[in-house]
């Protein structure tokens, strides 16, 4: 039986949500050059896969975190899936902006949380973990307890692993970088010669250069 990590990795590859271009890297908003790009928001356009993600995240929330009082999605990528999970579990939903609105109530958190609530945060992708953990901080400032985070995918960067450890946030993901690379190699999505390039990038993405 396939693990969830491998199964979801295959599904992402099937809908071409994963782009692997070692010779022609992407440029992230951070300025990092990357041979790997994950656009798992594409799952929203496939009803059966969208439902799969909703049910798997909901199962993880129930199995891993016990009593949960609310679901929070990190804007903007995790808002749709977070809302679907909250609906499935019949729980209140909020979402957390990256910056407060510049008009109206200037909210950072949209929706209603009450002090003492136990919250699970939903995220679509973990890279450095910075924006995800800012959302956690905002929820904690509201007097709530973040009991965990569930994300669709993580790159597994050392900086993110350390950041989540320091923030004392239990992170669970549906799949990860290693599972996607393994599936991509087995299905011919990438070649053997691509693997060292991709491995070197993951070890030090901030300083990686194509062809080196």
Curated annotation (Swiss-Prot):
**GO molecular function terms here?**
magnesium ion binding; orotate phosphoribosyltransferase activity
Q: Which cofactor does it need?
A: Mg(2+)
Q: Does the record's keyword annotation contain Transferase?
A: yes
The organism's place on the tree of life at top rank: Bacteria
Q: Which residues bind orotate?
A: 127
Could you state one GO biological process linked to this protein?
pyrimidine nucleobase biosynthetic process
State whether keyword Lipid metabolism applies: no
Disulphide bonds annotated for this chain are: none
- Catalytic reactions on record: orotidine 5'-phosphate + diphosphate = orotate + 5-phospho-alpha-D-ribose 1-diphosphate
Residues binding 5-phospho-alpha-D-ribose 1-diphosphate, per UniProt: 97, 101, 103, 123-131
Query: Which EC class does it fall in?
Result: transferase
**Which residues fall in a coiled-coil region?**
none
Q: What does this protein do?
A: Catalyzes the transfer of a ribosyl phosphate group from 5-phosphoribose 1-diphosphate to orotate, leading to the formation of orotidine monophosphate (OMP).
Which protein family is named in the record?
A: Belongs to the purine/pyrimidine phosphoribosyltransferase family. PyrE subfamily.
This chain belongs to the protein called Orotate phosphoribosyltransferase
From which source organism is this entry? Phocaeicola vulgatus (strain ATCC 8482 / DSM 1447 / JCM 5826 / CCUG 4940 / NBRC 14291 / NCTC 11154)
Name the gene for this chain: pyrE
